[in-house]
Each structure stands twice: as C-alpha cells, then as structure tokens.
C-alpha cells in the first residue's frame, strides 16, 4: 500500500468540514463507513491508479479481476473524491434511513461489484459494434457509477415532481438520464459508460430481477437481523427501516438529521447543487486550463497519460 505524499488536498478538507458540520453521530453507520473507506483509500491507495482502474483489456484479457473491487474506492484526485462523497452523504442519509443499515450495506457492496461488471460489458459491446478497440482500453475509477445506481433508487422511492437541471424542468423519474447527458455534455472527460452502468444497475434493482435475487441470496441472514441496538421491520419489500440508539438509550433521529442537512446544502436539492457545479465547471474551464479533474473521473489510456505528462513537462 502506497501512502500519498501530496500537499494539502482542498477537496478532502471541504469534505471533512461538511461531515463534521452535520455531525458524525448524525450520519447513518453504513454511509459513514463508506465515506471512511473511500477517504482511507484516497490517502493510502492500495495500488497506483493505473493498476486499480477497470478496463476490458486489464480485467478480461489480462484476468486482473481484483480491479473490480479496487476501482470503486479509488479516486483521481481530491475533487473527484469530494464530489462523489458529498453525493454519497446526500443519498446515504435518505436511503439508509429508509432501507436499514444492513440492507443498505448489502446494496452498496452489490452495486459496487455490478457497476464494474456492467461497465465492462458496455465497453466490450461498444468496441465490437463500433469496431473501436480503444473502448477496451478505457480505464475508469471512482464511486460515481454506484452513486448513479443509488440515484435511481432514490427516485424510485420518492417518485413524482420535477427537478431543475441546467434551467430545464425534468420529471423526477427521468432525472438520472438528464444528469447523465448534462454531465457528459459539460464535462466530456467523464466516463459516460461508467455512469450509464450505474443507471442500468439501479434499473435492474427497481424494475428487474436484481432485488429478488438479492432477497434470495440474503435469505435467512436478513430474517434474523434483529440484534443489539437496532430494530428492523420486514415486509415483502425487504427491510423498510430501522432505529438506532445512543448508548444511553435515546433514539437517533435521522429525520432531524435530514432536515438539518439542508443547512449545509443551503436548502438546495441535489439537482440544484449539480446545476451550480456544472455551470461553475463550464465557467472554470473557460477561464483556466488547470482546473480540477471533473466529476466522474476517467483515466485515459496509458499512451494518452504519457503524452499529457510529457506536454506538462515541456511547458515548464
């Protein structure tokens, strides 16, 4: 494991400040653990990024399948980590409260693996159908595919209404597709296939057989989940909620946490935050060449990385 020797990471500091602003005790446990794991691997990468990212060439042709486990928890830089983990905070507070910690952890683990598998299938299909072998070499890292899958779940459990994306009202059920197009249009360096893979995995859960398969695999472990400090409630839709307790027996009120979450988001919905971020990205890319790597970071092929590195040294 290689420890980073970089200077101050502004994105990481902003993420930590927002976590402490909400209060660690107010963040559901699996959401908090997911943030901690991603921050840990950012500070202590298991392998260099080029040996952690997933591509058809590396995973399938070279049988390096451990990349499926490594790629979701590695990020290109501190801003990539910041945008992904702030989005995880927003989704985790809502979904973990509704689904329960154990089921939410099960979802995170399953989605992390499946988004990588679907990404590889999409890249392989694109390479074969379009006769473009470069698709097999595109190497991606980051948690954004899982976040798009969670966004599908969030829209499924809270249907109806409209969101505003780049000034256009979009029905909530189509918000994921609009965000996919908006992010790809405004930041073309992002992994379109990685984000699309997340949406497809989310649809497999809400509209397809994935949830039933997960129910069957969980089986008796989920049905016996009533253990110390948590009260689980089950119905034909799986675990529907839980209640955590402080050590003195007082319940943790995550509903109040969700309301307080508006304080540090300035009362903006996730879509409104996305719109502001995209507009800021457009402005920033129009005024500077050295901005942070955009949301949904995708590693270019090795030759492109070498060319960019040489170009940077030539300019010094």
From Swiss-Prot:
Expressed in intestine, lung, brain, kidney, epididymis and testis. Pfam families: Rhomboid (PF01694). GO terms for cellular component: endoplasmic reticulum; endoplasmic reticulum membrane; endoplasmic reticulum quality control compartment; mitochondrial membrane. It is found in: Endoplasmic reticulum membrane; Mitochondrion membrane. The chain crosses the membrane at residues 22-42, 104-124, 138-154, 183-203. GO terms for molecular function: endopeptidase activity; peptidase activity; serine-type endopeptidase activity. InterPro entries: Peptidase_S54_rhomboid_dom, Rhomboid-like_sf. It catalyses: Cleaves type-1 transmembrane domains using a catalytic dyad composed of serine and histidine that are contributed by different transmembrane domains. Residues 269-284 are annotated as: Ubiquitin-binding domain (UBD). Residues 43-103, 155-182 are extracellular. Residues 1-21, 125-137, 204-316 are cytoplasmic. The active site is at residues 144, 195. Inhibited by aprotinin. Residues 301-316 are annotated as: VCP/p97-interacting motif (VIM). One of its GO terms (biological process) is cellular response to UV. Gene3D superfamilies: Rhomboid-like. Its EC number is 3.4.21.105. Intramembrane-cleaving serine protease that cleaves single transmembrane or multi-pass membrane proteins in the hydrophobic plane of the membrane, luminal loops and juxtamembrane regions. Involved in regulated intramembrane proteolysis and the subsequent release of functional polypeptides from their membrane anchors. Functional component of endoplasmic reticulum-associated degradation (ERAD) for misfolded membrane proteins. Required for the degradation process of some specific misfolded endoplasmic reticulum (ER) luminal proteins. Belongs to the peptidase S54 family. Interacts with BIK and STEAP3. Interacts (via C-terminal domain) with VCP. Interacts with ubiquitin and ubiquitinated proteins. This is Rhomboid-related protein 4. It comes from Rattus norvegicus.
């Amino acid at each position: 494991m290689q420890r980073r020797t970089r200077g101050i990471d502004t994105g990481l500091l902003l993420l930590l400040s927002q976590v402490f602003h909400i209060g660690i005790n107010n963040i559901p446990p699996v959401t908090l653990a997911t943030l901690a794991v991603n921050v840990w691997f950012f500070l202590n990468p298991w392998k260099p990024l080029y040996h952690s990212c997933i591509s058809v060439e590396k995973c399938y042709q070279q049988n390096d399948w451990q990349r499926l486990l490594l790629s979701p928890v590695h990020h290109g830089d501190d801003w990539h980590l910041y945008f992904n983990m702030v989005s995880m905070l927003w989704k985790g507070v809502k979904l973990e409260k509704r689904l329960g910690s154990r089921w939410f952890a099960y979802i995170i683990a399953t989605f992390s693996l499946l988004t990588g598998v679907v990404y590889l299938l999409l890249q392989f299909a694109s390479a074969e159908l379009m006769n473009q072998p470069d698709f097999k070499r595109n190497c991606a890292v980051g948690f954004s595919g899982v976040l798009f899958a969670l966004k599908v779940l969030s829209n499924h459990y809270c249907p109806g209404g409209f969101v505003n994306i780049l000034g256009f009202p979009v029905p909530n059920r189509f918000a994921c597709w609009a965000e996919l197009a908006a992010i790809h249009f405004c930041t073309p360096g992002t992994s379109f296939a990685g984000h699309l893979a997340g949406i497809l995995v989310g649809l497999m859960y809400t509209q397809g057989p994935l949830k039933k398969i997960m129910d069957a695999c969980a089986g008796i472990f989920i049905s016996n989940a009533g253990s110390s400090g948590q009260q689980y409630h089950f119905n034909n839709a799986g675990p529907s909620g839980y209640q955590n307790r402080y050590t003195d027996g007082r319940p943790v009120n995550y509903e109040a946490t969700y309301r307080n979450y508006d304080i540090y988001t300035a009362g903006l919905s996730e879509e409104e935050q996305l719109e502001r971020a995209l507009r800021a990205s457009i402005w920033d890319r129009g005024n500077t060449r050295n901005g942070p790597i955009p949301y949904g970071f995708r590693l270019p092929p090795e030759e492109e990385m070498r060319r960019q590195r040489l170009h940077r040294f030539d300019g010094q």
